[in-house]
């Protein structure tokens, strides 16, 4: 029977984790957002902590925090060549949302990282 060699965590430690240094590029424009709901499952789970940067451009396929009226939501941004904007959920139980000119709509920031809790 083979036994794996004893692993010493200290042999692989690079140093202390500094989440501000490692995950935040624009401190004055970065916010943490806690996820409520399951529209982005299985990719993002309820309770996950999202790190959102307002200075990073949202591009096709970006996960974004958007505001429609007074409601904020996490969605995947889909930009069509004809200028149409769609907001997509990862969870197939939710229908896509087409953004129209009469909507009070804003991309509030781009999600850069998600911290999920086990």
Each model region followed by its residue ranges:
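Short, hydrophobic/aromatic-rich segments at coil-to-beta transitions
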Residues: 30, 59-64
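Well-ordered beta-strand positions in beta-sheet-rich domains
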Residues: 49, 74-76, 96-98
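Short, positionally conserved secondary-structure boundary motifs
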Residues: 1-40, 71-72, 95, 108, ...
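Structural motif
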Residues: 47-49, 62
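A structural micro-motif recognizing beta-strand termini
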Residues: 34-39, 53-55, 67, 90
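Glycine- and charge-enriched low-complexity intrinsically disordered segments
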Residues: 79-118
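Short, compositionally biased
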Residues: 38-41, 62-74, 78-85
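Short, well-ordered loop/turn sites that connect or cap secondary structure elements
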Residues: 43-44, 58
């Amino acid at each position: 029977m083979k036994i794996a060699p004893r692993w010493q965590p200290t042999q692989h430690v690079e140093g202390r984790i500094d989440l501000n240094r490692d995950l935040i590029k624009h401190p004055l424009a970065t916010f943490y957002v806690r996820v409520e709901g399951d529209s982005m499952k299985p990719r993002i789970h309820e309770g996950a902590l999202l790190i959102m940067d307002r200075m990073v451009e949202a591009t096709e396929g970006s996960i974004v925090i958007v505001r429609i009226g007074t409601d904020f939501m996490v969605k995947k941004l889909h930009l069509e060549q004809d200028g149409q904007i769609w907001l997509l959920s990862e969870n197939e139980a939710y229908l896509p949302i087409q953004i129209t000119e009469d909507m009070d709509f804003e991309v509030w920031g781009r999600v850069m990282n998600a911290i999920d809790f086990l």
